Design a protein with these regions (language model features):
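Predominantly flavin-linked oxidoreductase catalytic cores and closely associated redox partners
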Residues: 133, 140-190
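Conserved dinucleotide-binding and phosphotransfer motif residues
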Residues: 46, 112, 145
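Short beta-strand to alpha-helix junction loop
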Residues: 93-101, 121-140, 185-190
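Extreme N-terminal leader/targeting segments of oxidoreductases
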Residues: 6-27, 45-46
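Glycine-rich active-site loop/strand segments that organize a redox cofactor
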Residues: 70-118
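N-terminal Rossmann-like FAD-binding beta1-loop-alpha1 element of flavoenzymes
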Residues: 25-52
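Glycine-rich FAD pyrophosphate-binding loop
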Residues: 44-68
Length: 190
C-alpha cells in the first residue's frame, strides 16, 4: 500500500466538497471481496474518502458462494485456544484477536442486521445460515458511509505516469488516487 497522505485524503472539514470532484484526494481499494470491503470500511472509519473498484458486476460474489455451506464466520473458542490453532503464527493471531475477536465479529454482524449463533461445534454462523443478508447489509452500510462502489472496473495495472488503469464497459479509465490498496484475493484454482 502507498503511504496515505492523510491531510489530502481525509473526508470532512472545509474541503469535503472537493472529495467528489478530485480523485487525487481519495483512496482506491481494488477488489470487492471481503478483504476489499473490510479495507474500505476501515479506511472510511478513519475518515478517508474511499472508492472501491470491482471487476465483476457486483461485490462479494465468492463470499456468496462460500455462504452456500452455511457461512462459518468464526469460532467461539477462547482467544488463547483459538490462536493456538495457528501454531507458529499463534502470537500474531493472538495480537489480531486482541483487536477483533469472535465477539467483535458477532457484534459487527449484528450491526449489519444479522444475528448469529454458536453451533454445537463451537463455530459461529448467521442465524439464517445465509451470506446474502450479511453482504447486503455490509454494502448498504458502506454506501451510507460514503464509499463509492464502482463495478465492471477490471484493474489492469499502472500506466507510465503512475495512474491506475481499469478496463470498463465504457472503455479504459485512468485514475490518480491519493493512495491505493489491492485486495484481489481468492485467485481461482483449477
Amino acid at each position: 500500500m502507498v503511504a496515505l497522505p492523510l491531510q489530502a485524503a481525509r473526508a470532512g472539514g472545509d474541503n469535503a466538497h472537493m472529495l467528489d470532484a478530485d480523485p487525487s484526494s481519495r483512496v482506491a481499494v481494488v477488489g470487492g471481496g471481503p478483504a476489499g470491503l473490510i479495507a474500505a470500511e476501515r479506511l472510511r472509519a478513519a475518515g478517508l474518502a474511499v472508492d472501491l473498484y470491482e471487476a465483476k458486476g457486483s461485490v462479494g460474489r465468492k463470499f456468496l458462494i462460500a455462504g452456500k455451506g452455511g457461512l462459518n464466520l468464526t469460532h467461539s473458542d477462547p482467544r488463547p485456544l483459538f490462536a493456538s490453532r495457528y501454531r507458529e503464527r499463534a502470537a500474531d493471531v493472538g495480537r489480531w484477536l486482541e483487536r477483533f475477536d469472535a465477539d467483535a465479529l458477532r457484534d459487527w454482524a449484528r450491526g449489519l442486521g444479522v444475528d448469529t449463533f454458536v453451533g454445537s461445534s463451537g463455530r459461529v454462523f448467521p442465524l439464517d445460515r445465509k451470506a446474502a443478508p450479511l453482504l447486503r447489509g455490509w454494502v448498504r452500510r458502506l454506501r451510507a458511509q460514503g464509499v463509492a462502489i464502482h463495478v465492471h472496473h477490471r484493474w489492469t495495472g499502472w500506466d507510465a505516469d503512475g495512474a491506475a488503469c481499469f478496463d470498463t464497459p465504457e472503455g479504459p479509465r485512468r485514475i490518480r488516487p491519493a493512495a491505493s490498496r489491492r485486495e484481489m484475493g481468492g485467485w481461482p484454482h483449477g
